[in-house]
C-alpha cells in the first residue's frame, strides 16, 4: 500500500494572449503549488484481480475519470502490471481552479510508473499527462513554473514563500461558458517573468471580470477579500485568493468569510518529489 499527498495549485495570474488554429487558447500564467492536498492510497490487488477500482469520489462514468484515464495510459508501458484499488480522500474542492483533478492524474502517473516498473522519465510522463489536461505536467514536475502555450510549456521559477487565504464560493463555474463569451479578453500583450516580479499587482486574470458578472457568489467572495488585500481568481474559478500580509488578522478574516475558506502556504516543490528523483 502506498499513501501519498496530491497537491493543489493557484494561478498567480492568467492572461490569454491569442488563439491557435485548432481552437485552443494561448496563455501565460504562473503556477504556484500550495499545501492543500488530496490523499491518495494505492493498494495492489492479487494476481487474480487485474482490474482497477477507484473509491472515495462520486463518478458516474469511470471512463471520464482522470485517475482512471491516467492509469489506462500508463498500463501500456507496465512491466509488472497488477490490479489496483485507488482510494482518494478529497480535500481540494472540485471544479474550483485549484487543479485537483489534474494533480490526481499526475500523482497516478508518478506512483504507477514505479509500482508497475514502467521506467518512464519525467518528460515522458509529462507527454502522457498533457493528453489528459494542459496543467497535468506542472504536477508531474512538481515545481513552480512560468507557463506558456496552452499551459504545457513550462519554465521553472523560484518564488518567495507566501501564505494565502482562499475562498471557495458556493457555485460551479462552467469553463466552456466563460470561453464562449464574446467579451472575454483573448489578446493580452505577452509579458515576462521579470515584469511580473517588478509589479505583480498589475497582473490579473482575464476570466475574473466574467466570473464576477456571471456568478454573484464569486463577486461576493472577491468583494470580501478586496477589503483586506488584492483578491484574485485562480484558473477559471470558482476559488479566489489573496496573499496574507503582516497586518491581516487571518483568523478573523476566515471567521467572517461568506463561504468556505482555506489558509494555505506556498510550496517550492511537490511532496511527491521522491517519486521524481528516483526515476
UniProtKB/Swiss-Prot annotation:
Pathway in which the depicted protein is active: Isoprenoid biosynthesis; isopentenyl diphosphate biosynthesis via DXP pathway; isopentenyl diphosphate from 1-deoxy-D-xylulose 5-phosphate: step 3/6
Entries under InterPro entries matching the protein: GHMP_kinase_C_dom, GHMP_kinase_C_sf, GHMP_kinase_N_dom, IspE, Ribosomal_Su5_D2-typ_SF, Ribsml_uS5_D2-typ_fold_subgr
Binding locations of ATP: 93-103
Active site, UniProt feature: 9, 135
A Pfam family hit: GHMP_kinases_N
TM spans (from-to): none
Assigned EC number: 2.7.1.148
UniProt keyword annotations, A-Z: ATP-binding, Isoprene biosynthesis, Kinase, Nucleotide-binding, Transferase
Domain of life: Bacteria
Catalytic activity: 4-CDP-2-C-methyl-D-erythritol + ATP = 4-CDP-2-C-methyl-D-erythritol 2-phosphate + ADP + H(+)
GO molecular function per UniProt: 4-(cytidine 5'-diphospho)-2-C-methyl-D-erythritol kinase activity; ATP binding
A Gene Ontology BP annotation from the UniProt entry: isopentenyl diphosphate biosynthetic process, methylerythritol 4-phosphate pathway
UniProt-listed NCBIfam families: ispE
Family of this protein: Belongs to the GHMP kinase family. IspE subfamily.
General function of this protein: Catalyzes the phosphorylation of the position 2 hydroxy group of 4-diphosphocytidyl-2C-methyl-D-erythritol.
Protein name, UniProt field: 4-diphosphocytidyl-2-C-methyl-D-erythritol kinase
Origin species: Acinetobacter baylyi (strain ATCC 33305 / BD413 / ADP1)
Gene that produces this protein: ispE
Amino acid at each position: 500500500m502506498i499513501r501519498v499527498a496530491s497537491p493543489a495549485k493557484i494561478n498567480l495570474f492568467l492572461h490569454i494572449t491569442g488563439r491557435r488554429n485548432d481552437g485552443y487558447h494561448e496563455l501565460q500564467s504562473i503556477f504556484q503549488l500550495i499545501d492543500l492536498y488530496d490523499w491518495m492510497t494505492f493498494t495492489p490487488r492479487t494476481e487474480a484481480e487485474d482490474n482497477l477500482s477507484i473509491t472515495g469520489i462520486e463518478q458516474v462514468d469511470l471512463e471520464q475519470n482522470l485517475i482512471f484515464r491516467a492509469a489506462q495510459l500508463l498500463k501500456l508501458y507496465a512491466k509488472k502490471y497488477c490490479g489496483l484499488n485507488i482510494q482518494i480522500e478529497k480535500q481540494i474542492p472540485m471544479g474550483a481552479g485549484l487543479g485537483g483533478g489534474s494533480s490526481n492524474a499526475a500523482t497516478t502517473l508518478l506512483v504507477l510508473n514505479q509500482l508497475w516498473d514502467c521506467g518512464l522519465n519525467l518528460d515522458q510522463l509529462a507527454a502522457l499527462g498533457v493528453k489528459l489536461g494542459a496543467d497535468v505536467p506542472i504536477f508531474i514536475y512538481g515545481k513552480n513554473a512560468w507557463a506558456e502555450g496552452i499551459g504545457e510549456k513550462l519554465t521553472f521559477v523560484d518564488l518567495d514563500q507566501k501564505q494565502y487565504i482562499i475562498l471557495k464560493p458556493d457555485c460551479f463555474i462552467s469553463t466552456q461558458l466563460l470561453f464562449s463569451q464574446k467579451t472575454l479578453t483573448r489578446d493580452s500583450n505577452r509579458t515576462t517573468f521579470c515584469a511580473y516580479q517588478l509589479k505583480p499587482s498589475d497582473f490579473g486574470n482575464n476570466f475574473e471580470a466574467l466570473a464576477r458578472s456571471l456568478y454573484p457568489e464569486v463577486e461576493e467572495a472577491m468583494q470580501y477579500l478586496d477589503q483586506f488585500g488584492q483578491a484574485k481568481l485562480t484558473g477559471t474559478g470558482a476559488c479566489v485568493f489573496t496573499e496574507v500580509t503582516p497586518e491581516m488578522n487571518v483568523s478573523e478574516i476566515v471567521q467572517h468569510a461568506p463561504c468556505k475558506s482555506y489558509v494555505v502556504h506556498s510550496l517550492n516543490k511537490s511532496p511527491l518529489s521522491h517519486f521524481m528523483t528516483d526515476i
